[in-house]
Curated annotation (Swiss-Prot):
Remarks, miscellaneous: This protein has four functional calcium-binding sites.
Residues reported in the UniProt entry to bind Ca(2+) 2: D57, D59, N61, T63, E68
Superkingdom to which the source organism belongs: Eukaryota
Binding positions (Ca(2+) 1): D21, D23, D25, S27, E32
Its job: Calmodulin mediates the control of a large number of enzymes, ion channels and other proteins by Ca(2+). Among the enzymes to be stimulated by the calmodulin-Ca(2+) complex are a number of protein kinases and phosphatases.
Organism: Mougeotia scalaris (Green alga)
Positions with a binding annotation for Ca(2+) 4: D130, D132, D134, Q136, E141
Keyword Repeat in record: yes
Protein name as annotated: Calmodulin
Domain (EF-hand): residue spans on this chain: 8-43, 44-79, 81-116, 117-149
GO molecular function list: calcium ion binding
Keywords for this protein: Acetylation, Calcium, Metal-binding, Methylation, Repeat
Segment forming the signal sequence: none
Residues given in the record as Ca(2+) 3 binding sites: D94, D96, N98, Y100, D105
Amino acid sequence: MADQLTEEQIAEFKEAFSLFDKDGDGSITTKELGTVMRSLGQNPTEAELQDMINEVDADGNGTIDFPEFLNLMARKMKDTDSEEELKEAFKVFDKDQNGYISAADWRHVMTNLGEKLTDEEVDEMIREADVDGDGQVNYEEFVKMMMAK
């Protein structure tokens, strides 16, 4: 995961890590995490801090080291990127920008992509993604469908 980061991103994250790692020992404790979060106006409980550490503490030593921190940041970035990409993709399909992808919208985009689909195939694709059964695909349904791929 972290191997997909640029050198610039790694340098930025190293700086951020140093802000958390108050005593400079190369690891972030729950106490250090709490200090930083409180300085940002958050008020996490000790249990919440422990949960946050445990979530990324790959070696189970109770603290976050830099490689673990990098993995966390890379995961968060990937989530953000894919959400933006999904919004853009949805806009491409939602021709009339009404918040829904109709069979006509779907057919139009697929044809432009060079996909020769029959009306039945288009209807079937819409049906598969159309969770609430209203005959069109809203953003939530689109995200579910894309994430399932």
